[in-house]
């Protein structure tokens, strides 16, 4: 009798586990691109709050979400190693996002323009990837089904 009860509990646990994953995988994937184009710490923090809230919401539902924050124009300061007012929060968010993911993309057009104006190379934080053009990256992500958010 104990063995039957144990087997039933294991079966229920497996059904619950696979039921949640099947539900998450059978639906539309959750993907969001967040635009940051202002050198404003409040806007940058709001973008990071949006990303964190998305991670927490879908984690509670046992679902994954992919978030990409694209910074260009004056917003590139968010991802500059020398001027970012939020680089500690970015490091923290990147560390806690698994199994979902938060990706940070820095516009190379903006980076090159800033380097030309400032007369020296600009270092981007290690959590960010340089993309050719921020606006193009946003457009391509939307074409792939990402939802668009501008804080």
Where are these regions (language model features)?
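Secreted/extracellular ectodomain signature
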Residues: 22-151
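Positively charged n-region of N-terminal signal peptides that target proteins for export
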Residues: 1-6
């Amino acid at each position: 009798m104990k063995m039957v009860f144990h087997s039933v509990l294991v079966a229920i646990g497996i059904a619950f586990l696979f039921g949640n994953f099947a539900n998450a995988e059978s639906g539309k994937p959750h993907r969001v691109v967040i635009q940051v184009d202002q050198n404003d710490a409040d806007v940058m923090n709001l973008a990071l709050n949006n990303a964190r809230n998305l991670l927490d919401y879908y984690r509670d539902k046992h679902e994954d979400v992919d978030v990409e924050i694209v910074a260009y124009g004056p917003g590139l300061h968010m991802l500059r190693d020398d001027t970012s007012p939020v680089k500690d929060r970015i490091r923290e968010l990147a560390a806690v996002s698994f199994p979902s993911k938060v990706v940070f993309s820095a516009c190379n057009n903006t980076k090159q323009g800033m380097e030309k104006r400032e007369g020296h190379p600009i270092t981007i934080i290690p959590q960010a990837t340089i993309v050719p053009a921020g606006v193009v990256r946003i457009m391509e992500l939307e074409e792939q089904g990402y939802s668009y958010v501008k804080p």
